[in-house]
């Protein structure tokens, strides 16, 4: 907090991560250092109405000064909070599917691989209008509700001047329910449905696989956080969700359906050590030309050590269980282990 006076508040957040990857995969091996800087502000309009906004930026620390392609805005949105009636904001924000994905995206470095930014409403996304209500209008303690709409983000072509086809979306909506069961237990569910753009169905690039009018996702999860123990598991069923990591891949597109599973267990010792173990898998079915294939599969073993609330060090070992197949080669999916130290 850097300012708090007369109903106006401004918070500053930041992070500097000196991060290095060790891997046999040349595309992953090497320096991955970055920094983040963010602001969050609030202004009290009256007893029931509060305005707020948030912005966060990430800058790479592993590129030459003349290169800035990896610098980007993570989130940026503004909104109004209406007391117990909830809040409404618009901008670049987290999709409602991440209300659950965040439960397992807590590993020292990796995790959250079955989701991804700019992939409909799975994670960070553009043009989202989000309504949130805590404790269901004050009627049900622990029941939080979110409803979201995302406007179309498309491109006339797949040129460098337009949006990458894998990161486009049509109009869509989603919602989530999170319930605090007490004693450290929570349960949640979420869904989203978005139309696919014509480019995502191969209008500009006939090589794109997996045509479909809509992308749909349904997810459920459980979490336990008490007594220094953290346990979480999330299962997701997707339809027409993307595969591949880049339009530069020789094969990219969408799986007819896929099942994603993430589970994590952690323990916080009083002296600052937090060991972590996790399992992550995304299995696609009926991928045109490839049949049933894993898109992600690994075990993660890591640990963080907190010197204090502002400083930590960590190591994270991603034990890749993916086989080297035609799909992994065509779609640019990594099959090598990675050790991250930061």
Swiss-Prot record:
Domain of life: Bacteria
A UniProt-annotated Pfam family: Porin_1
Chain segments annotated as coiled-coil in the UniProt record: none
InterPro entries according to UniProt: Gram-neg_bact_OMP (IPR050298), Gram_neg_porin_domain (IPR033900), Porin_dom_sf (IPR023614), Porin_gammaproteobac (IPR001897), Porin_Gram-ve (IPR001702)
Signal peptide: none
One GO term (biological process): monoatomic ion transmembrane transport
Disulfide bridge partners, by residue number: none
One Gene Ontology term of the molecular function aspect: porin activity
Compartments where found: Cell outer membrane
CDD domains the record matches: gram_neg_porins
Protein function: Forms pores that allow passive diffusion of small molecules across the outer membrane. In R.aquatilis OmpC is involved in the adhesion to wheat roots.
Subunit structure and binding partners: Homotrimer.
Family: Belongs to the Gram-negative porin family.
Protein name (Swiss-Prot/TrEMBL): Outer membrane porin C
Organism listed in the record: Rahnella aquatilis
């Amino acid at each position: 907090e850097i300012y708090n006076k007369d109903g106006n508040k401004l918070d500053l957040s930041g992070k500097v991560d000196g991060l290095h990857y060790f891997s046999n995969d040349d595309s992953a091996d090497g320096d991955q250092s970055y920094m983040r800087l963010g602001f969050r502000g609030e202004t009290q309009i009256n007893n029931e109405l509060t305005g707020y906004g948030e912005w966060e930026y990430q800058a790479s620390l592993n590129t030459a000064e003349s290169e800035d392609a990896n610098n980007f805005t993570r989130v940026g949105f503004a909104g109004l909070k209406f007391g117990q009636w909830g809040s409404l904001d618009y901008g670049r924000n987290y999709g409602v599917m991440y209300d659950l994905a965040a439960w397992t995206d807590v590993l020292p470095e990796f995790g959250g691989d079955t989701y991804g930014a700019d992939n409909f409403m799975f994670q960070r996304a553009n043009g989202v209008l989000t309504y949130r209500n805590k404790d269901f209008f004050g009627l049900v303690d622990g029941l939080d509700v979110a409803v979201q709409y995302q406007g179309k983000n498309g491109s006339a072509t797949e040129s460098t001047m337009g949006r990458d086809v894998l990161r486009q979306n049509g109009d869509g909506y989603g919602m989530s329910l999170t319930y605090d069961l007490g004693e450290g237990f929570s349960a949640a569910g979420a869904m989203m449905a978005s139309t696919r753009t014509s480019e995502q169905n191969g209008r500009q690039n006939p090589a794109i696989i997996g045509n479909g009018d809509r992308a749909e996702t349904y997810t459920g999860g459980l979490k336990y956080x008490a007594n220094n123990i953290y346990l979480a598991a999330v299962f997701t069923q997707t339809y027409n969700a993307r595969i591949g990591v880049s339009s530069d891949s020789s094969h990219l597109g969408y799986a007819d359906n896929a099942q994603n599973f993430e589970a994590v267990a952690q323990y916080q010792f009083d002296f600052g050590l937090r060991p972590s173990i996790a399992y992550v898998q995304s299995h696609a079915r009926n991928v045109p030309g490839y049949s049933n294939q894993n898109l992600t599969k690994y075990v993660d073993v890591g640990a963080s050590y907190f010197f204090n609330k502002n400083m930590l060090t960590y190591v994270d070992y991603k034990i890749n269980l993916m086989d080297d197949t035609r799909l992994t080669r065509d779609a640019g999916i990594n099959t090598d282990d990675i050790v991250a130290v930061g």
